[in-house]
Amino acid sequence: MSLLTEEIPMRPDDQLAAGARNLLLNCAGLKARDRLLIVHEDPSLGWYDKAAPLALGTEAEAMGISTAFVEVGGPEDDESSLTADRASADCDCVVYMARIGDLNRFEVGADNKIRIMCYARDADALASAYGRTHHDAMLELKDAVNDVLLGADRIEVSCPLGTDFSCDITDQVREFGDVAVQRFPVGVPQAILAEGLNGRVALARYLTPTGNRSYKPASLAFDEIVFANVKMGRIKGYEGDTATVADVECHYKTVSDIFGIDPECVHSWHAGIHAGAAFNKPAADDPDRWSNNVFTNPRFLHIHTCGAYAPGEICWMVLDPTVSVEGKNLWQDGRLCLEEFAPLRQAAQKWPILSDLMANPSDEIGLSG
């Protein structure tokens, strides 16, 4: 078991405690005498700090929740998942402050435990608006966005770099509840299936993993914009600098060969809805870490590709999208619009914190300019 068990400190500061309670009470629904396991990643790997799991455990113990810790490695460490599974046998809830919580998150769980993947990677994130915005408010915002998108016949998407595609919505089934592992904070609506997606997507800066499975190289960096041409959810080719196109095609072949999957499939897409999401390090330091932190910010729409399943293996990150439904913008230049559609207006009226959040978004996204 983790040494953190012996290191639970004094109560965290008020904002950090509020973020912890938001997760424990509003997301997990825990109560006194419940049993909690916090699976936390080795801080030396650079994705999670030590202070956030400590703060969560401190607040849980103060609430009368029996708390245990286990430290794990990264997603490429096969033993980590086994270690976490063994440690969770007698608990009611598992909170993953570790990337292994994201692996195969779309699979259906069979043990009825509450499982939560925490994207607040450090104490600063947990204490910020990202961690403190009421979980129920974000759930209602997600539902409102789903109402608009899933009720549409066609959605139009563009971006300043030249992305221009439409997506026809054909009887997509509404998902109630989250994937097998709940996500905290709530950051994206239901993914829109790309079977009816036609147009082109500007690929810029990086191709990154979706977090579903671990592979190497995890990302591809490039300087020139490449356009992916898509027809009915299939990649039909790339346009742009010859060498860069070759690099993109090679990366797709590498990843698809590793898993024996369809490299041409564009499975689904969604855009961020949590304006508190921040990434204060340069994306170039670790493009994988960047994209898997910042994807919940409304300034990004991301597209799941390479694999005919959710969420695929390679992600396209589209900066500052405009997403239009019936001639009205749901996102405009990377800002989620609360006023254009009745479901969002109603959510904002019920939860004024949503208007405050959108009026004061985080623009720390790891990119300059």
List each language-model region with its residue ranges.
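Internal helix-turn-beta structural module
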Residues: D288-D356
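Active-site bordering "gate/hinge" segments
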Residues: M1-F227, K231, V325-G369
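Short conserved micro-motifs at the rims of enzyme active sites and ligand-binding pockets
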Residues: R213-S214, G240, N280-A283, E313-W316, ...
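A broad, low-specificity signal marking well-ordered, structured residues that form hydrophobic/aromatic
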Residues: I155, G199-V201, H267-W269, L301-I303, ...
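A generic structural signal for well-ordered coil/turn residues at beta-strand boundaries
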Residues: L197, E224, C265, N297-R299, ...
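Dual-mode signal for accessory low-complexity, basic/Gly-rich regions
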Residues: A221, G237-Y238, A243-H304, Q349-I365
